[in-house]
Amino acid sequence: MQPIRTMRPAETGFAAAARRLLRVKLPPAALLAAAAATVAIAVAAAGWRSTTALTPSAAQLDEWQAMVAQAAEPHALARLRDLARAGSGAAQAALGIALVAAREPGLRDEGRGWLETAAQAQGADNAPAARRAQLALGKALLLGSGDMPKDYARARALLGAAAEHGDAAAAYYLGLIYRSGYGTAADPVQAAHWFEIASQAEIPAADFMLANAYRDGSGVPRDEARALALYRRAAEHELPEAVQTLAMAYRNGELGLRPDADAFHAQWIETAHALKHPVVGP
């Protein structure tokens, strides 16, 4: 029986392929062609490994975004800029979100520019980044950010695009636009529709706004039981407005509740607690 020959470490990979080519009896032209093919495969594989190694994860992008937003950390800023300039929609959105509320006007302008770029990105791969950018830019234009002037029409367009593709936070802000008539005619039905979508994602502020709609019959049929359930769910997330509304309902006997002094005082204490630990907005 012939002994099994094991390949030495030096004969693995590209080096092994080259040695095998040298041992094969081929005409010179065929040998050169085979060698060129081997080199091309090796270069392609190395390039793939390099690209893969340089592609950051979503968690890494989030970390760099936080570092830039909090302290304009130079390394994180440089990495996001490199990736954004190379066409990464995710990096463009992360950099834009990090810089749009920066202290320096130049950085704020840069942030808005990256958000505009990311918001217009096309293709399935860029869709999540486009939604993030549309939400961030739409929110900034609706509420105001730094020296960026409010632009309700542009905000409605951006938030509408994001909401239509399933972004619950964008749906909430779109509901605010239609409820109060920011840059458009107030539309209680549209407001309730978008608050409902955001509420399904259990956004406490959306629960509260939808509860108000059911309580008042604004855009939806009046339904105090539904309103009470939504207020309670928002209060469970310590939304101060919801906790305070429940307290007043117990005091005055509203929303189908009987007056209850003990429940009122308990809710009032919860209101004070909730105000010390406000819920972060969507």
Indicate where each model-derived feature is located.
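N-terminal intrinsically disordered, acidic low-complexity segments at the extreme N-terminus
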Residues: 1-15
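N-terminal Sec-pathway targeting helices
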Residues: 20-34
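N-terminal leader/linker segments that initiate helical-solenoid repeat arrays
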Residues: 39-97
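Structural signature of tandem alpha-helical TPR/SEL1-like repeats
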Residues: 71-75, 105-114, 148-158, 185-194, ...
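Short helix-capping/linker turns of helical repeat alpha-solenoids
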Residues: 72, 86-89, 101-103, 121-124, ...
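Canonical positions in the second alpha-helix
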Residues: 81-83, 118, 123, 161-162, ...
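Hydrophobic face of amphipathic alpha-helices that form TPR/SEL1-like repeat modules
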Residues: 94-101, 134-143, 173-180, 207-216, ...
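Terminal, low-structured helical/coil segments at or just beyond the last alpha-helical repeat
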Residues: 245, 251-282
